[in-house]
């Protein structure tokens, strides 16, 4: 294991050195992330090289790419991953007043800093990260924006194929085994294993948005025609096997239509404060599992936030969320989040705090830490994340994320 890590470190150094030769086109960062899980008493490590490439062929045509090379000992099945996060051709004004991007894209909709209910084109890895909000995976897409004038634009997104969130097979089986085992145990049936079959949609995904700048704020309305990125159980069938009962589980991806409204601008009455908000009205495909509807009626999800920097350099971001990232339908509930960073005068230290509270069961998530900037290009952040609440509470279900986090980042 140590030898493999050393080889990978050498490869990373070679790649970074090669990139520096083409300094005009390449940029990126090298990040180490370590988590010490307090309950399991183990340390996991991730080394991430993110290379960004930009090359202009003409004033109107350029190519851009974002390649991620990641090594992690969290996954023994696939510790080394090479991920082309983005790679696309960008044409600007080749067609008058039209900007077109085509290739593997990350499409960001919504004005919120995190957990926007309008941001639905790109899947994310399993789990919810409170330390890295930029984990989305690229998808094959075309993004065309037509500028009607200096303050109004019309944007259209087209994905020829639906790309769901990826969950490792063994991890997915464990999730559904723990989900359905109690139900069958109550009937006197012991489930020993799970077989999973996915039914993927064969229709494209698309969306359209029109936005406009006003005197003190920007606003946009949008429509998304696509699917839920995470699978829902569709068929559940216990089958006798040679070594016990096997659960044959069919998973599908319900369709959904999302009508959205987003805005960003000055907060009334507080100079320098910014108000952001996203509102989604979601119409799901009715989805029935074992005689009960997992999805049926239309519902709302929303995020509203304010950020402000005080005269003594304290940055505050306060947000209200109705419907967390993992909640859909009648499971949606209210949360409050706060993010605070204090820049100290004549100091390279920056203390920070991230907190969230469920307004339904009052469970809490807290992350207390500090960053140290050795230079403009290199920094280290140490934080401690802990949960307050019962295991069945909203945040109590996330006890596995508790621990110490160390992140070192070098930009080049």
PLM feature spans:
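Residues that define the transmembrane beta-barrel architecture of outer-membrane proteins
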Residues: 41-47, 80-85, 136-140, 202-206, ...
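Detector for outer-membrane/organellar transmembrane beta-barrel domains
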Residues: 224-226, 264-357
């Amino acid at each position: 294991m140590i030898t493999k890590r050393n080889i990978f470190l050498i490869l990373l150094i070679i790649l970074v050195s090669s990139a520096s030769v083409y300094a005009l086109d390449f940029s990126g960062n090298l990040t180490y992330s370590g988590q010490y899980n307090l309950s399991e008493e183990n340390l996991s490590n991730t080394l991430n090289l993110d290379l960004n490439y930009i090359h202009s062929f003409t004033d109107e045509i350029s190519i851009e790419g974002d390649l991620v090379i990641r090594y992690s000992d969290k996954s023994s099945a696939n510790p080394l991953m090479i991920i082309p996060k983005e790679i696309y051709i960008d044409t600007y004004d080749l067609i008058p007043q039209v900007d077109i991007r085509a290739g593997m894209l990350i499409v960001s909709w919504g004005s919120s800093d995190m957990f926007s209910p309008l941001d639905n084109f790109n899947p994310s890895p399993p789990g919810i990260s409170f330390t890295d909000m930029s984990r989305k995976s690229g998808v094959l897409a075309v993004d065309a924006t037509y500028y009607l004038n200096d303050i109004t634009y019309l944007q259209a997104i087209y994905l020829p194929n639906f790309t769901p969130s990826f969950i490792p097979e063994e991890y997915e089986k464990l999730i559904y085994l723990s989900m359905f085992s109690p139900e069958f145990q109550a009937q006197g049936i012991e489930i020993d294993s799970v077989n999973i079959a996915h039914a993927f949609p064969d229709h494209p995904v698309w969306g359209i948005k029109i936005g406009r700048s006003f005197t003190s704020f920007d606003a946009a309305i949008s429509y998304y025609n696509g699917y839920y990125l995470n699978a829902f159980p569709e068929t559940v069938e216990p089958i006798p096997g040679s070594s016990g009962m096997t659960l044959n589980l069919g998973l599908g991806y319900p369709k959904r239509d999302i009508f959205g409204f987003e805005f960003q601008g000055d907060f009334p009455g507080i100079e320098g404060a910014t108000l952001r908000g996203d509102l989604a009205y979601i119409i799901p495909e009715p989805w029935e599992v074992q005689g009960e509807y997992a999805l049926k009626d239309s519902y709302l999800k929303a995020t509203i936030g304010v950020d402000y920097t005080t005269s003594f350099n304290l940055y505050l971001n306060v947000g209200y969320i109705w419907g967390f990232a993992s909640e859909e339908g009648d499971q949606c509930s209210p949360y409050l989040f706060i993010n605070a960073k204090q820049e100290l005068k004549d100091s390279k230290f920056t203390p920070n705090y991230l907190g969230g509270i469920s307004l339904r069961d009052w469970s809490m998530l807290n992350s207390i830490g500090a960053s140290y900037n050795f230079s403009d290009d290199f920094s280290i952040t140490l934080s401690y994340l802990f949960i307050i609440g019962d295991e069945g509470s909203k945040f109590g279900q996330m006890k596995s994320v508790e621990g110490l986090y160390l992140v070192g980042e070098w930009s080049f």
